[in-house]
């Protein structure tokens, strides 16, 4: 559990804290974290996967709070679920290919505005309830 929390929760926070100042000084001013819909408490309708789910719920909270801490830095902080992707983890029955996920995410990230900071989105840009 500890290793998963380090990877999925603590590492994104350390990366965000390390690069926030440089990102805010740059042209894009966007910091995006890839989470999972499995980290949504309101979307959770089944048991299992406790370690993964809790680590993604934790990174959602961490990045939501980080977005509040960086409001004065002109930095857009957003969280995305990449979709159910055909990968080793998602399996062959998943809904979309990695290419489809990335193409959609790139468009959504490009379209982010200051009004989106601190929000949680699906790969297609629709908001996800916490």
Model-derived features: positions:
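C-terminal helical subdomain
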Residues: 72, 79-80, 91-130
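Active-site loop/turn elements of alpha/beta-hydrolase fold enzymes
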Residues: 34-36, 82, 123
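Flexible, glycine-rich phosphate/dinucleotide-binding loops
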Residues: 40, 86, 127-129
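Catalytic loop of short-chain dehydrogenase/reductase
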Residues: 1-6, 10-14, 20-71
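A short local structural element in Rossmann-fold oxidoreductases
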Residues: 43, 89-91
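Short, flexible catalytic-loop segment of classical short-chain dehydrogenase/reductase
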Residues: 82-88
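Acidic/histidine-enriched, beta-strand-rich ligand/metal-binding domains
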Residues: 50, 80-81
């Amino acid at each position: 559990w500890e290793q998963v929390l380090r990877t999925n929760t603590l590492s994104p926070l350390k990366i965000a804290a390390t690069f926030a100042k440089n990102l805010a000084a740059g042209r894009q001013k966007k910091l995006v974290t890839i989470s999972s819909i499995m980290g949504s408490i309101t979307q959770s309708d089944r048991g299992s996967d406790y370690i993964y789910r809790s680590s993604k719920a934790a990174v959602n909270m961490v990045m939501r709070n980080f977005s509040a801490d960086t409001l004065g830095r002109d930095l857009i902080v957003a969280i995305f679920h990449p979709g159910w992707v055909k990968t080793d983890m998602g399996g062959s029955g998943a809904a979309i290919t990695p290419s489809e996920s990335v193409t959609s995410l790139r468009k959504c990230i490009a379209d982010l505005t200051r009004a989106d900071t601190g929000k949680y989105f699906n790969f297609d840009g629709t908001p996800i309830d916490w």
